[in-house]
Regions:
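ATP/nucleoside-binding phosphotransfer catalytic cores, i.e., glycine-rich phosphate-binding loops
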Residues: 165, 170, 181-182, 232-310
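Gly/Ser/Thr-rich active-site loops/lids in small-molecule metabolic enzymes
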Residues: 173, 187-232
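A residue-level signal for conserved active-site and pocket-lining positions in enzyme catalytic cores
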Residues: 28, 82, 86, 108, ...
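Short glycine-rich anion-binding loops that position phosphate/pyrophosphate groups of nucleotides
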Residues: 30, 87-89, 112, 200-202
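ATP/NTP phosphate-donor binding region
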Residues: 2-80, 84, 121-136, 147-157
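Catalytic core of DAGKc-family lipid kinases
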Residues: 112-193
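Short, acidic/small-residue loops that bind anionic groups at enzyme active sites
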Residues: 100-118
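Short glycine/serine/threonine-rich phosphate/pyrophosphate-binding segments
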Residues: 34-35, 88-93, 203-208
Length: 310
């Protein structure tokens, strides 16, 4: 179906092989514009005899006739997922299908985002482009966070943007010991929290905390402290295979682990989180030439010198 071959690298690359037979939909449940797009997607799929599937919790967004599945079964056999909402909805969709390596098309039904590919009025053209194989798949580095309590692994969390250890609002400072790669102790951080971000996540919480914007084509991990109470307050940029080990120190209050904006668990003193590059890349569908820096310019209302001084 699509053209191109070879091993994809970071950035827009070759299309996946095979025809489009089964499509999944992830819909922002509280946004009427996303529900309207869901009905549009359902009509398109029915007209082309494409099997459409949604999550059981979002069945009403696409109509009662659309088959639904629980999260564990949702990605099985899918050729594509369409996320209807904003960047948060797209991150949720990617999290559902990350291990299955299903590409995701993000449709923006909210504010300008860095990840969604098309605006709401561009959905019909984008769906036709995907049907005809006129699209590419962009690979993004992901994160895998291994959580240990009492030296025993209790969970592994996958993230596209970031993994955050953060104190509760009323608690005193988070105290976290950091090791980098296979080396010894690097530093003890006293801060509101610590962010480990992918290049994709560099425009999210890490940026708000003072971190740099990093090209999504770069393989890297970013370590950014949140409001640090120490002289060293800069972001570290690491090779993704080096990894970061975060230990909640005994004198620290319990911290909250947040994965792609979702609070997933409380971490008591002594808990350890080891973050490395994920085994699976996030796969984003692109129907137009990706221009990351145009998005940065638009998001932050940047202008060239002539516009600023004129």
């Amino acid at each position: 179906m699509p053209e191109g071959s070879g091993e994809p690298r970071r950035g827009a690359q070759v299309n996946p092989n095979g025809s489009l037979r089964r499509v999944g939909a992830v819909v922002h449940p509280a946004r009427p514009s996303a529900a309207r797009l869901g009905k549009e997607l359902a009509d398109w799929a029915a007209e082309l005899d494409i099997e459409l599937r949604t999550l059981a919790s979002e069945r009403g967004c696409l109509g009662e006739d659309v088959p639904c599945a629980e999260p564990a079964e949702f990605p099985v056999g899918l050729d594509l997922v369409v996320a209807l909402g904003g960047d948060g909805t797209l991150l949720r969709a990617l999290g559902l299908v990350l291990a299955a390596e299903v590409p995701v098309l993000g449709v923006n039904a909210g504010r300008l985002g860095f990840l969604t590919e098309v605006e709401a009025d561009g959905l019909p053209a984008a769906l036709d482009a995907v049907r005809d194989g006129r699209y590419q798949v962009e690979r993004r580095t992901t994160l895998a966070a291994r959580v240990l309590l009492g030296g025993r692994e209790v969970a592994e969390d996958l993230a596209v943007n970031d993994v955050v250890l953060e104190k509760s609002p009323r608690e005193r400072l988070a105290l976290v010991a950091v090791r980098l790669g296979d080396g010894g102790p690097f530093a003890r951080y006293a801060a509101d929290g610590i962010i480990v971000a992918s290049p994709t996540g560099s425009t999210a919480y890490s940026f708000s905390a003072g971190g740099p914007i990093v090209s999504p084509r770069l393989d890297a991990l970013l370590l950014t402290p949140i409001a640090p109470h120490m002289v060293f307050n800069r972001t570290l940029v690491l090779h993704p295979d080096e990894g970061v080990r975060l230990e909640v120190l005994p004198e620290s209050p319990p911290l909250i682990e947040i994965v792609d904006g979702r609070a997933v668990r409380e971490l008591p003193p002594g808990a350890v989180v080891e973050v490395r590059r994920g085994r699976h890349d996030a796969l984003l569908v692109r129907v137009a030439r990706a221009d990351f820096y145009r998005l940065v310019r638009s998001k932050f209302r940047l202008a060239d010198g002539a516009e600023q001084t004129g």
